[in-house]
Amino acid sequence: MRITLFDVQAMKPAGQRIAMLTAYDHPSAVLAERAGVPMLLVGDSLGMAVHGFDTTLPVTLDDMIRHARAVVRGTSRALVVADLPFLTYATEADAIASARRVMQEAGVQALKLEGGATIAPTVRRLTELGVPVMGHLGLTPQSQHTLGLRVQARQAAEARRLLDDALALQDAGAFAIVLELVPTELAQAVTRRLQIPVIGIGAGAGCDGQVQVWHDILGLFPGKSPRHAKRFAEIGTAIEDALRAYVSEVQSGTFPTEAQSSRMKPDELSRALNAE
């Protein structure tokens, strides 16, 4: 049975930490579900992690639907949340149209929107229409040209604004909120003030749960990972080694072997070659 937003919300008073992870395709969704990840995020971060863009801004609604549909097909238990991408919810009408497409065409169970009090009316309207919404505050990548890619809300006024935004989203009906790259102390204070779950990324250990990017925690990309990510494996190195071995065996003629080949009866081959 699939996890519901009510199950997720019940984890907070029960003291159960929520593990959330991005997934962008069918294989990653299958593996994440087998590992027991309760909530998967089809983030617009796929623009960078999968498509090679420098930002999330080029990601379209069609991109999100295509990837989210694949993730949903790979799950039967995990709650699947999808981002609405840049400027697809600038107005209430846009948000409703975008939400309808993603919910109907991809089959996700919830949507994530970036922004605070300014989008609270949109969040309220979507929830009234039966669309579960997760908020996203702090570093909001769709606003990186105005906010920058840095830790947010270090100063008192900014911190107060973030808390007010979180309360506004909760009041509008958001079932949970992601806090990205905010000071640990502030994230913990917001988590304590809210009744809904707060899921952190680069926001310290005081949140109700954590979300991380698939590629970061598996070490798929060479070089240094983001500071907030722990590399639980070095899958990228393992893949590279396997590919080198494949190239080497093809070039040396040691692959394929008899084990990877099929045979036919000699007389059948003869009849085929000599047929007029």
Swiss-Prot record:
Ligand binding (Mg(2+)): 44, 83, 114
Any one GO BP annotation for this protein: pantothenate biosynthetic process
Principal subcellular localisation of the protein: cytoplasm
Gene3D superfamilies according to UniProt: Phosphoenolpyruvate-binding domains
Signal peptide: none
Function: Catalyzes the reversible reaction in which hydroxymethyl group from 5,10-methylenetetrahydrofolate is transferred onto alpha-ketoisovalerate to form ketopantoate.
The enzyme's E.C. designation: 2.1.2.11
Catalytic activity: 3-methyl-2-oxobutanoate + (6R)-5,10-methylene-5,6,7,8-tetrahydrofolate + H2O = 2-dehydropantoate + (6S)-5,6,7,8-tetrahydrofolate
Keywords attached to this entry: Cytoplasm, Magnesium, Metal-binding, Pantothenate biosynthesis, Transferase
HAMAP family linked: PanB
Binding site for 3-methyl-2-oxobutanoate: 44-45, 83, 112
Region Disordered, residue ranges: 256-276
Annotated active site: 180
Involved pathway(s): Cofactor biosynthesis; (R)-pantothenate biosynthesis; (R)-pantoate from 3-methyl-2-oxobutanoate: step 1/2
Gene transcribed to yield this protein: panB
Sample GO molecular function, one term: 3-methyl-2-oxobutanoate hydroxymethyltransferase activity
Cell compartment(s), UniProt: Cytoplasm
Assembly with partners or alone: Homodecamer; pentamer of dimers.
GO cellular component: cytoplasm
Family from the record: Belongs to the PanB family.
The protein's name in its UniProt record: 3-methyl-2-oxobutanoate hydroxymethyltransferase
Cofactor(s) in the UniProt record: Mg(2+)
Pfam families: Pantoate_transf (PF02548)
Cofactor comment: Binds 1 Mg(2+) ion per subunit.
PANTHER family named among the record's database cross-references: 3-METHYL-2-OXOBUTANOATE HYDROXYMETHYLTRANSFERASE (PTHR20881:SF0)
Classification via CDD domains: KPHMT-like (cd06557)
